Amino acid sequence: MSEQEIGKDYELKVRRNPQSLLEEYPRKGNNIQSTHYCAGCGHGIIHKLIAECMDELGIQERCVMISPVGCSVYAYFYFNCGNFQTAHGRAPAVATGMSRAEDDAIVMSYQGDGDLASIGLNETLQAANRGEKMTVFFVNNTVYGMTGGQMAPTTLIGEKTVTCQTGRDPNYAGHPTHMCELINTLKAPVFIERVSLANPLKIRLAKFAIKQALTIQKEGKGYSFVEILSPCP
């Protein structure tokens, strides 16, 4: 389906929060009016897109989200479904165990680039190569966001971070890791897609990809991977 078709067919509606998001996520002190995410962060948008798809597919009661160390770990405050918090990079192993132990579960691994493409790279590729029944949502903001914006494996050439203040130099730090392209070299994955949150149309396309990935899970077809290019202010 083309971008034009997506934009044409998408009906804008004023909606309440999806049932797959918790009604309240209370915080304390000076943070009482805010979420855990910085202003301009893409995580909130992604949460709502995933939750809407869970509702529309009728899979909330079957869903289990794996949220490892990083900004991703806060997902358990917001999603109204099962959740496991894991050590940095270990989400694919935990997701594999959950998927194999509970065959009817819809297993989602929600990971950032500093987690999935760095300390968790080996486990990510091995789970994809085995074709494990899981859906991976890879939130790529090209930096280590939680710890202050250091260079990550996905940081682009010339992109400035606190640890490469003149921009990433491939002669010193190598080239960015492109996860979709890496996973596409494997035979087992069923669905691989890269989307972004750059504008309203791109957000609609992101939801379309998320729903496709979860549909594959619902139908028990195997491994799906959605990379979401997300801002980190």
Located regions from the model:
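Thiamine diphosphate
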Residues: 2-145, 208-212
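Contiguous hydrophobic segments
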Residues: 3-17, 33-35, 108-115, 168-183
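A generic structural signal for short
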Residues: 38-39, 82-83, 111-113, 168, ...
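Gly/Ser/Thr-rich loops at beta-strand to alpha-helix junctions
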Residues: 42-45, 114-116, 230-233
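Glycine-rich ThDP/TPP pyrophosphate-binding loop and its adjacent helix/strand module
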Residues: 118-135, 139, 143-233
